[in-house]
Amino acid sequence: MSKKSAETVKVVVRCRPMNSKEISQGHKRIVEMDNKRGLVEVTNPKGPPGEPNKSFTFDTVYDWNSKQIDLYDETFRSLVESVLQGFNGTIFAYGQTGTGKTFTMEGVRSNPELRGVIPNSFEHIFTHIARTQNQQFLVRASYLEIYQEEIRDLLAKDQKKRLDLKERPDTGVYVKDLSSFVTKSVKEIEHVMTVGNNNRSVGSTNMNEHSSRSHAIFIITIECSELGVDGENHIRVGKLNLVDLAGSERQAKTGATGDRLKEATKINLSLSALGNVISALVDGKSSHIPYRDSKLTRLLQDSLGGNAKTVMVANMGPASYNFDETITTLRYANRAKNIKNKPKINEDPKDALLREFQEEISRLKQALDKKGPSDGRKKGKKRKPGEQGGDDDIEDETEEEGDEMDEEEMYKESQQKLEEEKEKIMANQSMIAEEKQKLLSEVQKRQGEIKKEHQQKEMLEGKIKAMESKLLVGGKSIVDHTNEQQRKIEEQRLLLAEEKNRERDMERKLKEQDDKTVEIEGTFSSLQQEVEVKTKKLKKLFAKLQSYKSDIQDLQDEHARERQELEQTQNELIRELKLKKVIADNFIPVEERTKITTRAVFDEETEEWLLTPLAKAEGPSQMAKRPVSAVGNRRPIADYARMAAQMGGNPRYKAENILSVDLDMPNRTTRDYEGPSVAPRVQAALDAALQDEDDLDLEVQPEVFKAKTKLKKDKVRSKHKAVAKPGSNSQLYPQARGLIQK
């Protein structure tokens, strides 16, 4: 049965070491940590010399010398173990930007000593599955990010696609259309995470070169099937949410501008909403928890005050210039200690994928059995789905392999017999051709049927193997002796972690008891001793008083700062609202504005304003679809009318009330260009030659050339004289002169 018990959120604090940039700039370390007592003390660098340190106590604290594996074994191993038992679990890192949240969650996967919570949890989950017996597991992985209040799937092809949050009474809040991948090993789930990390939004600021610009959530769903006492399979589903939050930041320190500033604004708003949820959960007076203020708080609704076991890692920096952010982080973490969750085991959920897999495998096996086993095939022992055993499993596997071999041999043998039968028919000369053809066709038909049946069986067996390969079953690949040793080592680790926690609690209680004992003991041996004791008590009380006064002043300053930021945001929003109102008043008619405002409705699920339909539609859609006969037209049209419209211009057969009229073209005022028939150079030479010019005296030419030229001129002149008769009225043309011959 599902057990439900209240337990508080476990809060641990981790402080990173000083980096080279902080040391070079002369900043000092202001944080001191006592790992045994779980105590964190912070010194105010700007306070007066006598101001006491601010102290905070947590479940566990880790200083700058802590190791990744110690953090996992002492804090997170028990949580992952409970997820394997069917609980919901959440691990999230909280703190200022550049304090090591991503290093705590992911670390360096290539180095075993520097691996973070997520890679260590992968190893833990699949090692546990490999060592279990009589259980079936199905492991799925999803990866999403919240970037500027938009949910994106980091494993999808289109990362820019926005996903919506939905809520159901049985499962709670979930992301619609979020992709999920079935993984069978550490290597496969690490590949899924690598693909998601490559798609995640990362940027550079003055405080962090690889600053996460979005909140990322890696979701591991572990489904386990086990045979119960009643003989039925019972499924438990555990979900592990590994959350890497983007850090809160101030624009003055990060130097963010443009897109980085927009990202920082959205990050700070969502983290502010997370802080408000934590404050409301701790404050018993508040009846409303503002989960809907951001997408992050809605996704973490079960983790904060719901059905989950939660561990919060508060990361902080030790440098003096981060005093305000460090104090704010510690205060939020101190509040979160008082949040109470009610985790329960998720047994037999309706949407368990493992059950669907088992039912599908059972259906395929029944379909395979209906095909009928061959004569030589052995019938193995039937088992119920989910029932597994050590040696029996190995024997059953060998039997199944033997069955497959027998089936293949029987198929080959039947094919060989049919081939021999075909050869006998072909060799028989006494048969009539028609009878021989009929027998051959029957044999070929039987061959085809056997082949088809064999292919169907192979296809079903392939599907069964593919689906069974996704179900993880332990106790086969690892020797039982090694499993037992690993179990003992894990038990010892858990015992050591519990002993350390008990030791811290005992030291804390002893310290409180000592203080109470001194107060109760009122007997003193002398007046001097009484004065010393009371002076010491007075100093301690005065130090507490000063500490409380300092806390009150800090809270007032923080409240004033938050109020100033809210007022600034409010002024910006009012200015933007006024601008839009001026645009609406001057450019949108009053009637149209009234229509829109009366139809506007705010949808809390999508957090958007929607317009209600003008008329109530009975069906799912308001507008009716176009008829099939009117594709591309306003109204239906017959085939005859369509053909008539194509053949002629009769407006009767037109689908639209529009007449097709030819364009009325104006009279032409220009003419086409006609190029010259003779080249310009040749025409120029001809024009020059046809002009009347004096005879040219070419003295440089030889005598022979002059004589020939003179003879030619005489001949030409004589011809012209013969043509032109005296007393004729015919037009006289100019005579050719120069070097051009006519």
From Swiss-Prot:
Domain Kinesin motor: 8-339
Binding site for ATP: G95, Q96, T97, G98, T99, G100, K101, T102
The keyword DNA-binding is annotated on this UniProt entry: no
Region called Globular, residue ranges: 614-742
Domain of life from the UniProt record: Eukaryota
GO MF term (any one): microtubule motor activity
Region (Disordered): 365-425, 709-742
Principal subcellular localisation of the protein: cytoplasm
Subcellular location(s) of the protein: Cytoplasm, Cytoskeleton
Stretch forming the signal peptide: none
Composition bias type Basic and acidic residues, residue spans: 365-377, 411-425
Pfam family, one: Kinesin
Composition bias type Acidic residues, residue spans: 389-410
GO cellular component: cytoplasm; kinesin complex; microtubule
GO BP annotations, alphabetical order: microtubule-based movement
Post-translational modification (record): The N-terminus is blocked.
Gene3D superfamilies (alphabetical): Kinesin motor domain (3.40.850.10)
Coiled coil: 338-613
Biased composition (Basic residues): 709-723
Entry keyword Cytoplasm: yes
Keywords, comma-separated and alphabetical: ATP-binding, Coiled coil, Cytoplasm, Cytoskeleton, Microtubule, Motor protein, Nucleotide-binding
Protein family: Belongs to the TRAFAC class myosin-kinesin ATPase superfamily. Kinesin family. Kinesin II subfamily.
Subunit structure of this chain's protein: Heterotrimer of a 115 kDa subunit (KAP115) and two kinesin-like subunits of 95 kDa (KRP95) and 85 kDa (KRP85).
Name of the molecule in the record: Kinesin-II 95 kDa subunit
